[in-house]
Amino acid sequence: MSDDHNNYDRGKVSRLPALPLPPDAITRQMFDEQISRGGHILNMHLVNAHAPKIARARRHVTYALRNECVASRKIREMVIVRTAGLVKQQYEINHHIPLALAAGVTREQLDALQGDWAAKKAIFSAAEVAALDYVDCLVERRGDIPDAVFDEFAKHYSPQEILELTHTSNGYYATGVFIRAMKIELDPEDRTTAPGKF
């Protein structure tokens, strides 16, 4: 591949060795799909490709969360940025800020989501506040959600949306921990993920 952003041979991008070349058939297929969906091959993809069958399985979940949810893209991006902020994972924040902006999240909201968003509750809708309270408990209290928080969340979201948002937060929490454990290097700003459906 001549495009530098989609070059497999980037060398070491984490604490793991560089991806052996040429990539196997599963990895090549995943990379080709990423490019066909409008994204670049990211450092995280190169690291995950050390276990191609696991990477392929994870991509199915990621694809579903990005393209097949009932919950709005805006609230999903808020949940992702908030979760990434709580686990202090700049890698995912960098990739999701453009997606969140495209989904209708404001710059002021994005700034708040990475810090003490509750001090700026007025810039969020009641449904967004309910979701963010839930996510904070999900991450900071390790899933110990008080009934009052869950009940308020359930007033605004269907059971399917509750599961979608819970899986979104859980998925990005796990990804944040994985990125930190592997010490994956940040991608350049112009190397972007596939945007998915808005």
Predicted stretch roles:
Residues 103-136:
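A contiguous pocket-lining binding segment that forms or flanks enzyme active sites
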Residues 149-152, 159-198:
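Preference for long, well-ordered alpha-helical segments
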Residues 45-48, 62-65, 78-84, 113-114, ...:
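Short alpha-helical scaffolding segments that buttress acidic/His motifs in well-ordered protein cores
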Residues 123-167:
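Acidic/histidine-rich alpha-helical segments that form the ligand environment
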Residues 55-68, 112-115, 147-155:
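Short amphipathic alpha-helical segments and their helix-coil junctions
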Residues 1-73, 197-198:
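Mobile cap/lid helix-loop segments that border enzyme active or cofactor-binding sites
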Residues 8, 35, 53-57, 88-94, ...:
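Short acidic alpha-helix initiation/capping motifs at coil-to-helix transition points
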Residues 71, 75-109:
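Conserved alpha-helical segments that form or flank metal/cofactor-binding pockets of metalloenzymes
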